[in-house]
Amino acid sequence: FSIGAAYSDLDFSTKGTETTSGVATVNNETTTKTGSGDLGSIFVEYTFAQGSTIGLDYIDGTAEIGKATRTSSTPSGDVTASASVSDPLTFYVEPTFMLTDTFGVYAKGGVTQLTVTPKEVDTASVVTSSYKAKDLNGVVTGFGAKFYMGNFFAKAEYLETEFDTYVHQSTTGTNAIIRADIDTEQTIFALGYNF
């Protein structure tokens, strides 16, 4: 049984499309945003005698993954749309090949869940469309290496995550429909302790 903490350099790509309804014309607004951020997480895991591992990783917090401004006549002025994600929880497995007693390499796979919350406001800071916060699932794949030092260990890994598409219709304002696709890439460094 092990516990640890990890630092992650996260790159994300978010592609969103908003379709407005209930107006004279139907507008489709599409934007793609990329960005990066630093995240910290905690994890618990169990390592088998052979070296392979199963575990859970949790990030406590919220991060903005996209923001764009467009000019609209309904409502008038600029409209700023944004989306944030919060509290990712990941279950993972690490099939491991130990090259020595203290050093091994592994493939990593798993599933993750997080909450996505989009919204948009106009120039008067009035919410023009509000969307339901929704849990999305994602598939995690990657690879890494681990090194043991007594009861301590260190890991370095690269991960990619592809999430389900977020789809929801606003219950206010223009009753717009939003669709968003989120993909992430992570470089992670972790330290842990074996009990």
Please place each PLM-identified region on the residue numbering.
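Gram-negative outer-membrane beta-barrel domains
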Residues: 1-195
